Each structure stands twice: as structure tokens, then as C-alpha cells.
């Protein structure tokens, strides 16, 4: 797929006024037909000094995006037979290439009309003022964002979907705006070796989303497409919604610095969010941090040639998370239509769905973190870096939990459980070689994190529905353990039970004549009986592994030779357990194809590594593998045209 991008920008100004304007156009073709995007971006920024004490500025940006039409079905394309006929003799598309209705033509709806356009306008303003008190200043920032989105689709009679419904139309209109207003009062003074930097913040945010949707089928003809929704004679639907949120914040932060040796920061922040319960909208989040710049001490002067900088850091702080949708504290009704009276009159009504119950006691999720770190630099910054150790404890997690259906509902958003994260992060920067014309620098990063669930609902029980287990990571794969592949006439011992193939019943039975694994046959995945009862049940599921890696590493290199620059990055992920999509054969065996080159089990190839192509996994289990991999990415080669050549053309840099 090709991508075309063009951009024009202009900037300039005087000592009092600066400006920048730009316009860009992007046309990106999609890999799949009708999946491209066209984007136009216009921006303008201007800053003006009004005397020596006041500076104001404004920035505007307008973006329009136009998306492709109806995307061809990739899944239907993958499941098609290579012998299928995609077109009729007259050149029109066939609905079903193999004369059966299991897998439609991937382009069966390609002739549908689609218009998807979004427009976004962002306006930001600021004012910086120096107040009459020495060291005191004030800044206010205001940002407004408006986004409109329109989607119109019409499936005419020349499409598979539209032909069955005599035309099908849908339009969606969405209007969203938000604004953020920040006011900062700053005080910065030095008194001898003492330096104080204080900031007070007042912030207000508000969001508003209005959305409406119409759909219908059975139109007289296709001429009006989605522009005449009143013409729909069947399946008319109307939907609309309004979502509003607001957030109010106060913050006070004081930084103290003595002789650049001893540093102390104390912060207090209060946040209020409209979506929480009436008595829990506000929460207070304090933090404190201290640092000791040892390299500034007099007793370290003798090491200055080797140890350029050494700083110890220690901090404790808390922050909040308001990651819930609006109105989760309220009961949320859904609309329905029912027949009333002897004549069966259609009447609109409302009901409380299983997941629509509100929780008026919802409150902020809080994370408290302790961090200890060290910053260092050697040999005049030829080698530098930092090491951080941290422990984070999160309480009152905002999660949807299941409850007994006898309550009339089966899930509710709640503050449940506690989690703990701890780990280490290391960054090293080095200048490996440096001469007049040549420089080679490297950056190494290492990160290790261990997380676990400390508590769920306070009763010591795990949550199997959400796959949350006390003492285990939050994101895990919970499934049956695959020991291998069932073979013909297989027989093995496990947990004191003897499992063998019964040719008469064509089943694998235990010594009591019970089926060990329902539906298993030669070529099926062999599952492990974890609880030792001699048969496979849901109780045999186990934690296969974590979805997050044990640790990650990266190594970046930048090489400069005169005006040439070459850079590349190695990124490594280690100890992550991933679902093996190419092993999940049921997703492929629905069609006429299978993955070429895979070592499938067959009677002639009784491998123990993979199952047969037609195997349908028991209880929808899947396959996993613990993986380590290293990627080479972000390879860049650049050349800076010498300034002596550019200056003749009036160009600053190229």
C-alpha cells in the first residue's frame, strides 16, 4: 500500500511576535480494499509579548479524516476454497463462490455506499504574567476540543446484505467537546544557598458527548441511499445518548533545594470526579520526595575526574484512577418493546438489564508507590544512567465483578481487591567512541516487573469468571494444560489412573470405563488431569502463564560520521506466555484451507507436537507457548546537507 504525505509550513516573527502556520495532506492506501484514510491538517500558532510582564498566545488546529468504504471480509477470504468462482459469467460478483451459504464472497458487500468522516478542531490559549511580587508569576491555560463524526452506510440491492433486505441503511452522528482550564500560581526565589519553588494549581475539565443513530431496511429503491431514512419500511430503530463528565482539581507543590545537595519535594493534590458516588467524588493524594546529590559534597572532590555525578533518590506518593464510565453509580435502564392488550398493541417500555445495576458507593482507585533510585555519571558523562526500584500497592480497584444471579443481576461495578507491583528499571547511556568526525553512542534499558493480586473481595476466594487469582498476576492465561497429542492405541499412566484407547467405543477410557476426555480421538490435544479424578473437567484448568513478560531489554545505537547519521534499535521481550493462533486449527478448519508448512498430526505423521487440522478444541481450550524474542527495529539513515551549501539558498537546515 502506498502512502503520500505533503506538508507546507511557514514561521517567523519579531522580538515581540512569533508565528507558525502549516498545512499537511495525507493519503494512505489500505492493505485491504477500501481501508485507506485521507487526512488534512491545518494549524496556526501565534505568541505575542505585551510589555515586559505579559505574554499571551493562541494555537488552533483543524483536522479532517475521511475513511475508506465497506471493508472486504478477511475471514471469508481466508476460508474460501481456491476452486471457488468469485464472478458470474456476466462479470457480477457471486454471493457464494462454492454454491453453499457457509462462506460468502469476501466482496459480497463491496458495492455498498459508505461515508465516514470526522472533523476535529482544537483551540488552545495561554497567558503568562509576572506579578509585582518578586519571584511570583501566574499562568492560565485554556484548551477547547471539538469533534464531529458522521457515518453513513447503505447496502443496496447489488450487495448480499442489501438484496436480502431490499436495501439496508444506517447513519450515525456524533458530537463531542471538552475543555480544560488550568490556572497556575508560581513562586520562585533564592535566599543564599536556599532555593524555593512553589506551585499552586486549580484545574477544571468538562466533557460532553451527544450521539444519535438511525437504521432501517426495506426501501422502495436504492436511489436515496441513506439520505432518506424515513423511507425505511421495516426494522426502524432510533437511538440517542448524552454523556457528560466533569473533574475539578487542586494542587500545591513545594520544591526546596539547598546548595544543589539536598532536595525535597512535598505535594498535595485533591481531585473530584462527577462519575463517583455523592459522598466519594473527592479524594486527596499526597506525595513526598527527597534526593541527596552526593557528588556535590566536599569529600567527593577527589573523585570528580572519575565520578561526575552521583545522586540518591527516595519518594513516596499516591495517585488516583477514575477509570469508570459515566453513570456507573446509577441504575441504567434499557428500552424494549412489548405487546399490550388483546389487540397486541406495541408499547415501548424499560427494564433493568443484568449489568445495569448502579453502585452509589463507587470511589477512587488509589495507588501508593515507594521508589528508591540512584543517578550516576562517570568519566565526564561518557557513561551515565539511573537505577530505580519501586513497590506499588493499589487498593479499591475499579472492576466489574460477578454476583449471584438470584439478586436479579449478574455483575456490578465495584471497588474490589488490592494488587501489588514491584520491580526494577535500569537505564545506561554510553559514548563508546568519540573523535573529531566520528561518534558512536548507545542506550541500554532493562525493566523487570512482578505484579500479583493481594486481595479480591476479602473472602479469600478467587474469581474464576474474570480469571483473577490471589497471589498471581492480574493478567494470566487460565486454561487446560496440553501434554501432547493423542495417538492411535495410546495408553499412559497419570495420577494413579490408567488411560487407554478403546477401539470398540472409539474413546479414551480410564480403568473404570469412564471417558477420560470427551470427544478425544487420535490427533486431538491430550489434556492433563490436574485434580486426579481420572477425567477431564473444568476443575483441571490451571494458570498456564502470565500475559506480561518476565523482563524486557532494549539496546539503541546512534552512529555519526561527519554529516551522516545511522541509528538502530534492538528490542527484546523475555518470558512472556502467548496464545499460539496458528495452533488453533478450529479457526481454519471451518473452510477449505489449512496453513501450509505446519507439522499437523496425521495417521502417517503421528507427531506429538501438533494436532490434526480438523481438531475442534475441547471446551474451547487453546494452545500457548512461553516465548523470548528480539526485534531489530527503527533503522534510520540520514544525511545533513552542509550549512555552507544551504546558506546560499537561504535554508537553515535540511
Task: Give the ranges of each region predicted by the language model.
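Extracytoplasmic gating/loop element in the C-terminal half of outer-membrane beta-barrel translocons
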Residues: 81, 100-102, 231-232, 273, ...
Amino acid at each position: 500500500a502506498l502512502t503520500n504525505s505533503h506538508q507546507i509550513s511557514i514561521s517567523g516573527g519579531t522580538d515581540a511576535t512569533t508565528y507558525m502556520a502549516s498545512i499537511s495532506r495525507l493519503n494512505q492506501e489500505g492493505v485491504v480494499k477500501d481501508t485507506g484514510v485521507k487526512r488534512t491538517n491545518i494549524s496556526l500558532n501565534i505568541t505575542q509579548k505585551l510589555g515586559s510582564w505579559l505574554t499571551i498566545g493562541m494555537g488552533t488546529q483543524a483536522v479532517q479524516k475521511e475513511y475508506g468504504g465497506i471493508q472486504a471480509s478477511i475471514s471469508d477470504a481466508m476460508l474460501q476454497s481456491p476452486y471457488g468462482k468469485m464472478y458470474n459469467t456476466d462479470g457480477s460478483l457471486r454471493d457464494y463462490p462454492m454454491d453453499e451459504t457457509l462462506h460468502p464472497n469476501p466482496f459480497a458487500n463491496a458495492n455498498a455506499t459508505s461515508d465516514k468522516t470526522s472533523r476535529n478542531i482544537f483551540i488552545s490559549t495561554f497567558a503568562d504574567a509576572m506579578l509585582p511580587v518578586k519571584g511570583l508569576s501566574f499562568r492560565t491555560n485554556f484548551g477547547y476540543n471539538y469533534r464531529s463524526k458522521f457515518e453513513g452506510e447503505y447496502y443496496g440491492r447489488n450487495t448480499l446484505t442489501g438484496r436480502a433486505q431490499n436495501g439496508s441503511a444506517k447513519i450515525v452522528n456524533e458530537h463531542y467537546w471538552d475543555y480544560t482550564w488550568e490556572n497556575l500560581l508560581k513562586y520562585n526565589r533564592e535566599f543564599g544557598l536556599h532555593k524555593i519553588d512553589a506551585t499552586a494549581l486549580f484545574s477544571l475539565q468538562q466533557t460532553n458527548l451527544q450521539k444519535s443513530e438511525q437504521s432501517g431496511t426495506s426501501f422502495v429503491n436504492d436511489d436515496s441511499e441513506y439520505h432518506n431514512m424515513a423511507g425505511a419500511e421495516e426494522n426502524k430503530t432510533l437511538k440517542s445518548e448524552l454523556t457528560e463528565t466533569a473533574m475539578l482539581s487542586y494542587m500545591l507543590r513545594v520544591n526546596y533545594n539547598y546548595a544543589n545537595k539536598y532536595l525535597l519535594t512535598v505535594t498535595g493534590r485533591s481531585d473530584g470526579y462527577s462519575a463517583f458516588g455523592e459522598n466519594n467524588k473527592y479524594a486527596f493524594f499526597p506525595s513526598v520526595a527527597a534526593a541527596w546529590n552526593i557528588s556535590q559534597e566536599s569529600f567527593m572532590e577527589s573523585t570528580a575526574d572519575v565520578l561526575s555525578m552521583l545522586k540518591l533518590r527516595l519518594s513516596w506518593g499516591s495517585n488516583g484512577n477514575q477509570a469508570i464510565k459515566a453513570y456507573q453509580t446509577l441504575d441504567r435502564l434499557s428500552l424494549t418493546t412489548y405487546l399490550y392488550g388483546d389487540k397486541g398493541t406495541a408499547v415501548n417500555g424499560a427494564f433493568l438489564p443484568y449489568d445495569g445495576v448502579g453502585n452509589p458507593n463507587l470511589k477512587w482507585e488509589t495507588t501508593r508507590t515507594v521508589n528508591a533510585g540512584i543517578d550516576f555519571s562517570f568519566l565526564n558523562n561518557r557513561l551515565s544512567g539511573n537505577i530505580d526500584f519501586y513497590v506499588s500497592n493499589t487498593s479499591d480497584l475499579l472492576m466489574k465483578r460477578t454476583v449471584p444471579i438470584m439478586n436479579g443481576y449478574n455483575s456490578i461495578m465495584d471497588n474490589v481487591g488490592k494488587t501489588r507491583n514491584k520491580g526494577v528499571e535500569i537505564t545506561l547511556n554510553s559514548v563508546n567512541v568519540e573523535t573529531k568526525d566520528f561518534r558512536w553512542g548507545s542506550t541500554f534499558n532493562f525493566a523487570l516487573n512482578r505484579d500479583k493480586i493481594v486481595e479480591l473481595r476479602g473472602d479469600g476466594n478467587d474469581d474464576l469468571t474474570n480469571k483473577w487469582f490471589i497471589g498471581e498476576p492480574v493478567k494470566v492465561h487460565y486454561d487446560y494444560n496440553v501434554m501432547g497429542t493423542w495417538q492411535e492405541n495410546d495408553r499412559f499412566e497419570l495420577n494413579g489412573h490408567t488411560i487407554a484407547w478403546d477401539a470398540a467405543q472409539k474413546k479414551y477410557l480410564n480403568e473404570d470405563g469412564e471417558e477420560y476426555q470427551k470427544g478425544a480421538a487420535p490427533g486431538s490435544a491430550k489434556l492433563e488431569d490436574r485434580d486426579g479424578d481420572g477425567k477431564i473437567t473444568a476443575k483441571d484448568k490451571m494458570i498456564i502463564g502470565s500475559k506480561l513478560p518476565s523482563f524486557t531489554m532494549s539496546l539503541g545505537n546512534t552512529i555519526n560520521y561527519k554529516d551522516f547519521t545511522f541509528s538502530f534499535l534492538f528490542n527484546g521481550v523475555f518470558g512472556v506466555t502467548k496464545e499460539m493462533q496458528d495452533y488453533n486449527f478450529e479457526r481454519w478448519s471451518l473452510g477449505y484451507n489449512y496453513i501450509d508448512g505446519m507439522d499437523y498430526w496425521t495417521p502417517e505423521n503421528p507427531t506429538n507436537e501438533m494436532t490434526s487440522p480438523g481438531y475442534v478444541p475441547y471446551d474451547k481450550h487453546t494452545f500457548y507457548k512461553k516465548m523470548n524474542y528480539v526485534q531489530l527495529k527503527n533503522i534510520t539513515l540520514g544525511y545533513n546537507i552542509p550549512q555552507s551549501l544551504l546558506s546560499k539558498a537561504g535554508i537553515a537546515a535540511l
